[in-house]
């Protein structure tokens, strides 16, 4: 008999990483010149509001099919390249590891009030400043 992998063995990091690789050809070099208003129209569903985006260049924002339901998918221009952000509802049954990497990309997961925030960027990208910038500007209504 084949060993069955249970769904609970999947990690949030693995799903997010696969999503970044899967979408990369579609959003590479795309700049939708995203406004704060557009971001907040999408974030509202997750109970979050971004209070400002000074110093942040957001090139893409949308809902995406993430594991068992929707998540927010946003791409921010980092120092070394694009940094992908996912806001994933907390009820999504995936194991959480605070950091993960595969040699090309690395990621961090921050459990926030209303959702888990996943950030993924280049191995050389410093994700902590991006995380702090976002976390300090996110306001939760839930």
Feature names for model-found ranges:
Residues 59-60, 71-75, 84-87, 109-111, ...:
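Ordered hydrophobic segments in well-structured contexts
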Residues 73-76, 81-103:
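Short, conserved beta-strand/beta-arch hydrophobic-aromatic motifs that form part
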Residues 1-73, 77-80:
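Juxtamembrane extracytoplasmic segments of single-/few-pass membrane proteins
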Residues 78, 96-142:
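A short, solvent-exposed beta-edge/loop patch
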């Amino acid at each position: 008999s084949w060993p069955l992998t249970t769904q609970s063995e999947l990690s949030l990091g693995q799903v997010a990483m696969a999503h970044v690789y899967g979408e990369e050809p579609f959003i590479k070099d795309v700049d939708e010149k995203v406004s704060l208003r557009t971001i907040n129209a999408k974030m509202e569903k997750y109970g979050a509001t971004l209070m400002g985006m000074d110093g942040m260049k957001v090139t893409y924002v949308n809902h995406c099919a993430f594991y068992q339901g929707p998540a927010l998918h946003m791409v921010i221009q980092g120092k070394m390249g694009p940094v992908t952000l996912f806001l994933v509802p907390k009820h999504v049954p995936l194991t959480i590891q605070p950091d993960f990497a595969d040699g090309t990309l690395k990621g961090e997961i921050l459990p926030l009030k209303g959702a888990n925030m996943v950030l993924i960027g280049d191995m050389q990208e410093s994700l902590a400043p991006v995380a702090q910038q976002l976390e300090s500007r996110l306001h939760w209504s839930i």
